[in-house]
């Protein structure tokens, strides 16, 4: 099954997430099919908190990809902004 989930990056205590499409069996931070954007939970000032290609996300959802709970809420948030 194909899922849309977050892959963690960044330093210790400073998380930064890439929003990726991956096979469910792949490791969290491992192999992925396509990168859709990023999420920075610790963004301050002028830094961008969320960048997501909504069109690509919609295309993957139409193909049957299942978003994680957090990614589903981020997609909804990105649609409001766009």
Curated annotation (Swiss-Prot):
InterPro entries per record: Ribosomal_bS16, Ribosomal_bS16_dom_sf
Organism: Francisella philomiragia subsp. philomiragia (strain ATCC 25017 / CCUG 19701 / FSC 153 / O#319-036)
GO cellular component terms listed in the entry, alphabetical order: cytoplasm; small ribosomal subunit
Sample GO molecular function, one term: structural constituent of ribosome
HAMAP family assigned to the protein according to its UniProt record, in alphabetical order: Ribosomal_bS16 (MF_00385)
Source taxon at top rank: Bacteria
Alphabetical UniProt keywords: Ribonucleoprotein, Ribosomal protein
GO biological process: translation
Protein name: Small ribosomal subunit protein bS16
Gene expressing this chain: rpsP
Record-stated family: Belongs to the bacterial ribosomal protein bS16 family.
